[in-house]
């Protein structure tokens, strides 16, 4: 059958050591030796991934996010494109939306940060925040929740509409 809901949780930069440290700390808060388990390690499905980028032994959030979102490695700093910096690649969010599913992306950081942006953006450089925000508005996804756009105004047209205004015009409800 077809899944009714799919949730894809990413602990950006988080590994086994960070989870163990948090669980050990929670156990210590209760005055005991040992761990107090976090809830997510008991989810019915989980995976650990090793995400070297296409060009570096240590990935960054853009290349790592792209690998997680698109299943393809790219160079550090790049979102939603192959390392040739010309070929855009589709993400799991695109696949879901094109299959008729509603797609929402939530984050605890700026909505145009590299990890969430890997699911909707296609840019050569992760620091192209205005372009990333523009692609969010045009993505066709249904829902976004996060901390703000990093650069909401077009640097070339500072008196033009903001990304908030453009998102609202596309039917998004803006809560700030």
Task: Give residue spans per PLM region.
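N-terminal catalytic scaffold of extracellular/periplasmic and nuclease hydrolases
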Residues: 1-176
């Amino acid at each position: 059958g077809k899944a009714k809901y799919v949730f894809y949780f990413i602990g950006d930069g988080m590994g086994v050591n960070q989870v163990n440290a948090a669980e050990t700390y929670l156990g210590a808060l209760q005055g005991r030796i040992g761990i107090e388990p976090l809830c997510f390690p008991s989810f019915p499905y989980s995976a650990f991934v090793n995400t070297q980028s296409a060009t570096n032994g240590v990935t960054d959030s853009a290349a790592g996010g792209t690998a997680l979102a698109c299943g393809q490695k790219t160079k550090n700093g790049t979102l939603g494109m192959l390392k040739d910096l010309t070929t855009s690649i589709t993400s799991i969010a695109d696949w879901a939306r094109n299959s008729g599913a509603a797609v929402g992306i939530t984050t605890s950081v700026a909505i145009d940060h590299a990890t969430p942006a890997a699911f909707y953006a296609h840019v050569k450089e992760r620091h192209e925040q205005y372009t990333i925000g523009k692609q969010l508005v045009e993505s066709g996804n249904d829902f976004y929740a996060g901390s703000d756009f990093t650069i909401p105004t077009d640097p070339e047209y500072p008196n033009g509409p903001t990304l908030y205004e453009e998102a609202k015009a596309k039917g998004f409800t803006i809560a700030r």
